[in-house]
């Protein structure tokens, strides 16, 4: 009997309130790194109706107009009208940053196990994942969920569907047969819109047609769409009130959207607003880099990496590889190859992936992984041939 199951992942648009917060936090980080890439940054953001609160810990020599950075980010997303719930020109922006604790800084500056190296900025566990379901070596449900909300923004910004507003969510339910993607069972797309697209609580018929034909169908592989595929477009109907007016937004609340859509475990640490001495971010990027190179090398069809750290200690507590039976050599041997070819100490990660750069705002919407952006060094597969040769393949 075929191993037939359904698996679902979701994504949210750049105008979703939590993603607005993430993008502001990473825009702050980038603005600081443009002047002082050795800064320590933990920038948190809250968004609500007409209000942005910036808080956290920042130690830097940079001089940044944090309020203007927040406004510019909100403008770029498309919140330029008070009818949308927040307007970059008129919203209140409150700033409440402290400096990084000296107690934390001493352990990061000089690792207890290697005084010349950088210690991990906190304890914790991180996961990386890759699989052969898509050319980008990402799970198909999260990959296509991202592409749906990304296209929503494109159609909104270029004027092809001018009734769209910034807030949106997508969800893709994939049917698997024999452990491989077979077809799409259900697509959910909810998007904020201008008032004339609804009659009472219901949407006008042309709205459904435009979303299905212009937004959804161009994104998804035709071979995965069947007569049984369900389209749920704005299933609750009217969606005029959205963004920070519809829900309070906070940095770090979309960690599954940011990673693999639930296809592998998550260590719990968010990414946005954090400089790369925080292993929550940098080690998760490194784990993706490792996993992707293992799959690209043909050592496994899917690969999950777990790493863990202790605060102030450079070397990871463990590097564990799981290939779920798809590996061509034992997982323990793959783990030894990882230790030999990747420096997963915090300083090693920062150097390996060139992370002391203002590259982070782009990561804060549409996923940190599975995107072939030139700044996303963790998406390179430059170690694949080395790993393949070392494995004797």
Curated annotation (Swiss-Prot):
Subcellular location: Cytoplasm
GO biological process: one-carbon metabolic process; S-adenosylmethionine biosynthetic process
Subunit architecture: Homotetramer; dimer of dimers.
Source organism of the structure: Leptothrix cholodnii (strain ATCC 51168 / LMG 8142 / SP-6) (Leptothrix discophora (strain SP-6))
Binding annotation for ATP: 16, 167-169, 238-239, 247, 253-254, 270, 274
A cellular-component GO term for this protein: cytoplasm
Location of region: Flexible loop: 100-110
Pathway: Amino-acid biosynthesis; S-adenosyl-L-methionine biosynthesis; S-adenosyl-L-methionine from L-methionine: step 1/1
Free-text remark on how the cofactor is bound: Binds 2 divalent ions per subunit. Binds 1 potassium ion per subunit.
Family per record: Belongs to the AdoMet synthase family.
Keywords: ATP-binding, Cytoplasm, Magnesium, Metal-binding, Nucleotide-binding, One-carbon metabolism, Potassium, Transferase
Summary of the function given for this chain in its UniProt record: Catalyzes the formation of S-adenosylmethionine (AdoMet) from methionine and ATP. The overall synthetic reaction is composed of two sequential steps, AdoMet formation and the subsequent tripolyphosphate hydrolysis which occurs prior to release of AdoMet from the enzyme.
Enzyme Commission number: 2.5.1.6
Gene3D superfamilies associated with the record: 3.30.300.10
Chain positions recorded as K(+) binding sites: 44
Residues annotated for L-methionine binding in this entry: 57, 100, 247, 278
Source lineage: Bacteria, Pseudomonadati, Pseudomonadota, Betaproteobacteria, Burkholderiales
Reaction(s) catalysed by this chain's protein: L-methionine + ATP + H2O = S-adenosyl-L-methionine + phosphate + diphosphate
InterPro entries cross-referenced by the UniProt entry: ADOMET_SYNTHASE_CS, S-AdoMet_synt_C, S-AdoMet_synt_central, S-AdoMet_synt_N, S-AdoMet_synthetase, S-AdoMet_synthetase_sfam
One term of GO molecular function: magnesium ion binding
PROSITE patterns: ADOMET_SYNTHASE_1, ADOMET_SYNTHASE_2
Residues holding Mg(2+): 18
Name under which the protein is recorded: S-adenosylmethionine synthase
Keyword Cytoplasm: yes
Primary location recorded for the protein, binned into one broad class: cytoplasm
Cofactor: Mg(2+); K(+)
């Amino acid at each position: 009997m075929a191993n037939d199951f359904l698996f679902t992942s979701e994504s949210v648009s750049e105008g979703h309130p939590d993603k607005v917060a993430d993008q502001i936090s990473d825009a702050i980080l980038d603005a600081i790194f443009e002047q002082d890439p050795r800064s320590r940054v933990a920038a948190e953001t809250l968004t609500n109706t007409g209000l942005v609160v910036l808080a956290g810990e920042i130690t830097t020599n940079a001089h940044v107009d944090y309020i203007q950075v927040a406004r510019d980010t909100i403008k770029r997303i498309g919140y330029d009208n008070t009818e949308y719930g927040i307007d970059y020109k008129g919203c209140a922006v409150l700033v409440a940053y402290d400096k990084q604790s000296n107690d934390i800084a001493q352990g990061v500056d000089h690792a207890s196990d290697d005084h010349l190296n950088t210690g991990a900025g906190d304890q914790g566990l991180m996961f990386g994942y890759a699989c052969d379901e898509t050319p980008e070596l990402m799970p198909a449900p999260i990959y296509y969920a991202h592409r749906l909300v990304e296209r929503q923004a494109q159609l909104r910004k270029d004027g092809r569907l001018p009734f769209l507003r910034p807030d949106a969510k997508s969800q893709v339910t994939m049917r698997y047969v024999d452990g491989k993607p077979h077809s799409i069972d259900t697509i959910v797309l909810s998007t904020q819109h201008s008032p004339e697209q609804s009659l009472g609580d219901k949407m006008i018929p042309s709205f459904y047609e435009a979303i299905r034909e212009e937004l959804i169908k161009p994104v998804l592989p035709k071979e995965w769409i069947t007569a049984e595929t369900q389209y749920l477009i704005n299933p609750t109907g009217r969606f005029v009130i959205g963004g920070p007016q519809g829900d309070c937004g906070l940095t770090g609340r979309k960690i599954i959207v940011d990673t693999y859509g639930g296809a592998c475990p998550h260590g719990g640490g968010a990414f946005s607003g954090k400089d790369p001495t925080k292993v929550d971010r940098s080690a998760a990027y490194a784990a993706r880099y490792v996993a992707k190179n293992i799959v690209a090398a043909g050592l496994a069809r899917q690969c999950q990496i777990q790493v863990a750290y202790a605060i102030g200690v450079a070397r990871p507590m463990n590097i564990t590889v799981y290939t779920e039976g798809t590996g061509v050599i034992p997982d323990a041997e793959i783990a030894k190859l990882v230790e030999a070819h990747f420096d997963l100490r915090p300083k090693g990660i920062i150097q390996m992936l060139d992370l002391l750069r203002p590259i982070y705002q782009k990561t804060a919407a549409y996923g940190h992984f599975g995107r072939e952006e030139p700044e996303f060094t963790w998406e390179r597969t430059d170690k694949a041939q080395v790993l393949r040769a070392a494995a004797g393949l």
